[in-house]
């Protein structure tokens, strides 16, 4: 019952009887999120959750993560999806070569970055 509720939450209820090999990359990623949610975590970490997905699958995974943030769950995301990071974040850290170069609100980082590496990166991706 709990598993079905979690599958429903990520839009996979109709795939409950499917074998993993029959699922798309985005569906497998959402299923991984279901497995993590089954542990009832207080915090979830996503490390480039869309990097291995086809472009058409990216949105479905980002929608699930957005829903989790709206439900109040604390989430740490390592991502190059800057528009997404800006939309869902309360706080943004820009890390370059393992060093935190800049930290602030999405507005601070995306509209008025100070560090040259942040400025350069954002000019290339936005």
How would you name each of these model-derived features?
Residues 18-21, 39, 71:
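Conserved signature/switch motifs of ABC ATPase nucleotide-binding domains
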Residues 44-47:
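Catalytic Walker B motif of ABC-type/P-loop ATPase nucleotide-binding domains
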Residues 59-71:
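Helical segment within the ABC ATPase nucleotide-binding domain
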Residues 79-80:
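H-loop/switch region of ABC-family ATPase nucleotide-binding domains
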Residues 85-87:
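A short, surface-exposed alpha-helical micro-motif characterized by mixed small hydrophobic
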Residues 103-104:
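ABC ATPase "signature
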